[in-house]
Amino acid sequence: MRTWVEIDKENLKYNILKLKELADNREVLGVVKANAYGLGSVEIAKILQEVGVNFFGLANLEEAIELQEAGINANFLILGASFEDELVEATKRGIHTAISSMQQLKFLVENNLNPNIHLKFDTGMTRLGFEVDEAEEVINFCKTNNLNLVGIFTHLSDSDGNTIDTKNFTLEQIEKFKNIVKGLDLKYIHISNSAGIT
């Protein structure tokens, strides 16, 4: 027995337009990491561009380069951790990069690199990201060193849960994130995933 998935292009476009509507027509970051979860990142990115998605989230530099080389003309954000050589290459290619440690920030400063950076904060996923209580220090470091801080984000770890505990945890994450970004004027402040919109 074989298993396969068929994607209806028109349904996908309709779903994206509905998500945009639910999100007050804010810009959508189309996450197409891991080959668009096995569906084909180039193909899915092209479909998403047909409905105005021009910013794509990827796991690593290699995935972003694949889309660039396939002729996808858009912004790209590496959501995962980047090694130092990847930070250099991302800067050369104009790829936005998630930054989740002071070590990465110091490397950028020491090597006179200034890519578009998005600070990732850990509000409960417990994987990558700055701790919430580091926010002021990290943001001040970026400002003091004239780093090109264009975004701040976190990940809702349990937004698809349907228990009182998971809903409360998601609300706690949102409150932590609101405290981090309060008073900041950045182009990209992103927290939500598909489940988090509803």
Enumerate the predicted regions with their spans.
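A charged N-terminal "starter" segment
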Residues: 1-96
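Short aromatic/basic micro-patch
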Residues: 6, 118, 129
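Conserved, mostly hydrophobic/aromatic
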Residues: 12, 33, 67, 101, ...
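Active-site loop/helix belt of alpha/beta enzymes
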Residues: 37-39, 46, 91, 110-115, ...
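Non-cysteine beta-strand/loop elements that form the S-adenosyl-L-methionine
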Residues: 56-59, 77-83, 100, 115-123, ...
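Short, well-ordered alpha-helical microsegments
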Residues: 64-65, 84-87, 105-106, 135, ...
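A polyampholytic, Gly/Pro-enriched intrinsically disordered region
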Residues: 99-102, 176
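Membrane-helix boundary/helix-loop-helix interface segments in multi-pass membrane proteins
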Residues: 100, 107-108
